[in-house]
């Protein structure tokens, strides 16, 4: 999938059909209800479940009050512009509770942990781990064999469209609770210490820390051993 630029994302959101899907559990004399074709029904006898757009389902419920004994509605979004990514055939490990929007690219053997939020246009390279509760903003790009630590935020850029997204090159380790501001590029093999706020580019093969993040040293063997990427965690 080719990465979308900001104008393409804006157009995608603007022109998308906004959706308010609902799931309704019904009980009553349901055989008397004429369900339209755009409502999916799973009904046996006097009970069942239906799926559809609220704009269609709401008047259906109102018009058939006499035939419905009881119902419960489940709804988790309103006028949503971007569907969630269809993950069924992605060659990666994606744990429950990750929220991944459509138009996201996920490489082979990547790992997405619980609670991660990945916005439209993001790219995750082969073998990269996105840890728990990480936020990847719109168009954020992470290279291959990286680790983005729990609770970290890579700032997204959709508006203004002229701004540049965060880019993390290959073999980078980002510690927990790091914030990387928009437009920052983290060079290949760099290490960002936990809790850092990265406001400017990070040179390849360096170690940075602090608020704002500053270079501490070049990557040495000791630091490399402490930040080793374990391929065993990425096997499917």
Curated annotation (Swiss-Prot):
HAMAP family registered for this protein in UniProt: DapH (MF_01691)
Catalysed reactions listed for this entry: (S)-2,3,4,5-tetrahydrodipicolinate + acetyl-CoA + H2O = L-2-acetamido-6-oxoheptanedioate + CoA
Species in which this protein is naturally found: Listeria monocytogenes serovar 1/2a (strain ATCC BAA-679 / EGD-e)
The keyword Amino-acid biosynthesis belongs to this UniProt entry's keyword annotation: yes
UniProt entry tagged with the keyword Transferase: yes
Paired cysteines (S-S): none
Major enzyme class: transferase
Pfam family name, one: Hexapep_2
Role of this protein: Catalyzes the transfer of an acetyl group from acetyl-CoA to tetrahydrodipicolinate.
Pathway: Amino-acid biosynthesis; L-lysine biosynthesis via DAP pathway; LL-2,6-diaminopimelate from (S)-tetrahydrodipicolinate (acetylase route): step 1/3
GO BP terms in the entry: diaminopimelate biosynthetic process; lysine biosynthetic process via diaminopimelate
A single MF term (Gene Ontology): tetrahydrodipicolinate N-acetyltransferase activity
InterPro entries with a match to the protein in the record: DapH (IPR019873), DapH_N (IPR013710), Hexapep (IPR001451), Hexapep_transf_CS (IPR018357), Trans_hexapeptide_repeat (IPR050179), Trimer_LpxA-like_sf (IPR011004)
Name assigned to this protein: 2,3,4,5-tetrahydropyridine-2,6-dicarboxylate N-acetyltransferase
Enzyme Commission code: 2.3.1.89
Cross-referenced Gene3D superfamilies: Hexapeptide repeat proteins, Malonyl-CoA ACP transacylase, ACP-binding
Domain of life: Bacteria
Family: Belongs to the transferase hexapeptide repeat family. DapH subfamily.
Keywords: Acyltransferase, Amino-acid biosynthesis, Diaminopimelate biosynthesis, Lysine biosynthesis, Repeat, Transferase
């Amino acid at each position: 999938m080719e990465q979308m630029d900001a104008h393409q994302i804006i157009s995608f959101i603007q022109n998308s059909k906004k959706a308010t899907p609902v799931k309704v559990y019904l009980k009553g004399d349901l055989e008397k209800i004429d369900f339209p074709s755009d409502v999916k029904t799973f009904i046996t006898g006097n009970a069942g479940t239906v799926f559809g757009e609220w704009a269609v389902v709401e008047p259906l419920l109102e018009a058939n009050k006499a035939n419905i004994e009881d119902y419960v509605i489940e709804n988790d979004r309103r006028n949503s512009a971007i569907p969630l990514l269809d993950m069924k055939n992605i060659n990666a490990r994606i744990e429950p509770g990750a929220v991944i929007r459509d138009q996201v690219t996920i490489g082979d053997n990547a790992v997405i942990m619980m609670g991660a939020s990945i916005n439209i246009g993001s790219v995750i390279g082969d073998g990269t781990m996105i840890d728990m509760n990480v936020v990847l903003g719109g168009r954020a790009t992470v290279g291959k064999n990286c680790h983005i630590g729990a609770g970290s935020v890579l700032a997204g850029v959709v508006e203004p469209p002229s701004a540049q997204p965060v880019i993390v090159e290959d073999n980078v380790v980002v510690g927990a609770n790091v914030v990387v501001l928009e437009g920052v590029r983290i060079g290949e093999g760099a290490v960002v210490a936990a809790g850092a706020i990265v406001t400017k580019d990070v040179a390849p093969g360096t170690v940075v820390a602090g608020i704002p993040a500053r270079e501490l040293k070049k990557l040495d063997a000791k630091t490399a051993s402490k930040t080793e990427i374990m391929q065993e965690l990425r096997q499917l």
